[in-house]
Swiss-Prot record:
Positions annotated to bind xanthine: L20, N27, K155
Biological processes per GO annotation: purine ribonucleoside salvage; xanthine metabolic process; XMP salvage
E.C. designation(s): 2.4.2.22
Entries under InterPro entries matching the protein: PRibTrfase_dom, PRTase-like, Pur/Pyrimidine_PRTase, Xanthine_PRibTrfase
The organism of origin for this protein: Porphyromonas gingivalis (strain ATCC BAA-308 / W83)
Keywords, in A-Z order: Cytoplasm, Glycosyltransferase, Purine salvage, Transferase
Highest classification ranks of the organism: Bacteria, Pseudomonadati, Bacteroidota, Bacteroidia, Bacteroidales
Location (main, coarse): cytoplasm
Gene (name only): xpt
The name this protein goes by in its record: Xanthine phosphoribosyltransferase
Length: 193
């Protein structure tokens, strides 16, 4: 997605340790027009997947997930990082955050993730695939089917895609970062695998 790639190169910031900061347009302050185009592309990519529910994890996945849900006319549910006192019938798993260097016990109400669901997971980043693996675990607990996973940005050098594809998950990323070596952002061309 050329518009996204240009924005990453223009406004993305690189930090040592493989960190790409896009908080000025994706995951703190959001460019709503860019987010709409992102959602349109995910809706196009997964139009024939049979998805009936969008799932994300708080917090940065919520905005794109809501937009995808709106365009596809589907409900959106987000996995919570803190258990509400009011949540019953809960499914839980542990997810490690790469950027925050900590584990979270995340949860979702089984009322909102069931064996009738064919879910599309939407998130801002795919790095090592930790959040995505957590979603797979929750889906398995609920006997829900994952029809695909869509990521705004993938850091290919952290190999999250391979781990997901080994489990038979369809992965679509709108911008694939090949390298952040020497804090230089290298984005894959459309024709690269």
């Amino acid at each position: 997605m050329e518009l996204l790639k240009q924005r990453i190169l223009q406004d993305g910031k690189c930090y040592p340790g493989g960190i790409l900061k896009v908080d000025s347009f994706i995951n703190h302050q959001m460019d709503s027009k860019l987010m709409y185009h992102v959602a349109e592309e995910f809706a196009r990519l997964f139009a024939d997947s049979g998805v009936n529910k969008i799932v994300t994890i708080e917090a940065s996945g919520i905005a794109p997930a809501i937009m995808v849900g709106y365009i596809m006319n589907l409900p959106v549910v987000f996995v919570k990082k803190k258990q509400p006192k009011t949540m019953d019938n809960m499914l839980t798993t542990t997810v490690h955050s790469f950027t925050k260097s900590r584990d979270y016990t995340v949860c979702i109400s089984h009322d909102f993730l069931t064996d009738d669901d064919r879910i599309l997971f939407i998130d801002d980043f795919l790095a090592y695939g930790n959040a995505a693996q957590g979603i797979i675990d929750l889906a398995e607990q609920a006997s829900a089917k994952i029809v695909g996973m869509g990521f705004i940005i993938e850091k290919a050098f952290q190999n999250g895609r391979e781990a997901l594809q080994e489990r038979g998950i369809r992965v679509e990323s709108l911008a694939i970062i090949r390298s952040l070596d020497n804090c230089c952002i290298t984005i894959a061309d459309e024709n690269e695998d």
